[in-house]
């Protein structure tokens, strides 16, 4: 007897196989949602409430995905499935393009999926990411205004609102990663990082050359970030606490600074938060001139 099944076989032989019932016992159990499922469930609810649709694509892509570091297969069955994707964004762009050809102009979607990349040890890594695409639709806020496209800052605000709902502190910095050079706008792209400096993902506007090539709106925005990092960060966050509502009115102060053009608003915001008191609750950029 070397395995568990060997022991079960001996018990069955001694007890008698003909004495076993042919029906399964009724066992009522309550399933447990792991942290990964809970994270996806929460993100999905936030994005669905924001008007997004969940999309699903294959992990295998062709060689023309606007990204050069896709992992090629040695013996693919189809030319359209000849590589493992290194990003979710090409498939999202392709879906929007195909929908526009069919007259469906309102496609704002997100996708959970695995991406593949090589590391310094000449091995391959598989990570779970979430990516999304939105914008490109001209709307108006009221009857007296003309149709307007979603601006970069309004699109950024949507992502910031998502992070706020997830109770995540995310920092934005200038984009230097060359992986997305053919997909994202060179001057309207930002890298997202967590408090400890770990790179979370990327957000940006579609590259104008790619938009013209595919006959897409230039006001189209894409994001992609690591789902495992989001899960770990949410897990490490402190639970939300409730406190008594203040009986005093809030105080709003307007501050003006003269700074070098190389200094970003994020740096100023960090200094204000670090030196502010416990009563400081919110910092917003009002104007730049």
Language model segments and positions:
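Conserved alpha/beta core surface patches that mediate binding of polyanionic ligands
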Residues: 54-55, 86-134, 208, 219-238, ...
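Short glycine/threonine-rich loop-to-helix capping motif typified by GTGT followed
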Residues: 1-6, 32-40, 66-70, 121-126, ...
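Short helix/loop capping segments that flank catalytic or ligand/cofactor-binding pockets
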Residues: 2-3, 55-58, 64, 81-83, ...
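A residue-level signal for conserved active-site and pocket-lining positions in enzyme catalytic cores
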Residues: 8, 47, 92, 132, ...
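Short beta-strand elements
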Residues: 6-12, 75, 114, 123-136, ...
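A carboxyl-terminal module marker
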Residues: 139-289
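Short, hydrophobic beta-strand segments
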Residues: 1, 22-35, 70-77, 126-146, ...
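Extended, well-folded interaction surfaces typified by the phenylalanyl-tRNA synthetase beta subunit core
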Residues: 1-110
């Amino acid at each position: 007897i070397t395995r568990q099944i060997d022991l079960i076989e001996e018990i069955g032989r001694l007890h008698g196989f003909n004495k076993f019932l042919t029906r399964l016992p009724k066992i009522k159990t309550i399933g447990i949602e792991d942290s990964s499922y809970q994270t996806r469930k929460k993100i999905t609810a936030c994005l669905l409430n924001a008007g997004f649709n969940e999309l699903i694509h294959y992990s295998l892509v062709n060689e023309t995905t606007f990204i050069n570091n896709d992992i090629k297969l040695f013996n693919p069955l189809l030319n359209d499935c000849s590589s493992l994707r290194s990003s979710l964004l090409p498939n999202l762009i392709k879906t929007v393009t195909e929908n526009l050809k069919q007259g469906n102009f309102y496609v704002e979607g997100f996708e959970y999926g695995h991406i593949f990349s090589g590391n310094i040890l000449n091995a391959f890594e598989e990570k779970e990411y979430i990516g999304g695409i939105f914008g490109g639709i001209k709307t108006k806020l009221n009857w007296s205004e003309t149709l307007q496209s979603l601006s970069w800052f309004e699109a950024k605000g949507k992502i910031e609102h998502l992070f706020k709902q997830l109770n995540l502190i995310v920092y934005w910095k200038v984009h230097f990663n060359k992986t997305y050079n053919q997909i994202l706008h060179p001057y309207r792209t930002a890298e997202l990082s967590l408090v400890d400096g770990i790179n979370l993902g990327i957000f940006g506007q579609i590259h104008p050359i790619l938009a013209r090539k595919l006959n897409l709106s230039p006001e189209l925005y894409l994001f992609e970030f690591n789902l495992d990092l989001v899960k770990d960060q949410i897990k490490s966050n402190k639970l939300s606490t409730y406190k008594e509502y203040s009986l005093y009115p809030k105080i709003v102060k307007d501050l003006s600074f003269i700074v070098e053009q190389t200094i970003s608003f994020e740096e100023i915001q960090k200094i204000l938060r670090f030196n502010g008191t416990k009563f400081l609750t919110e910092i917003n950029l009002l104007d730049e001139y």
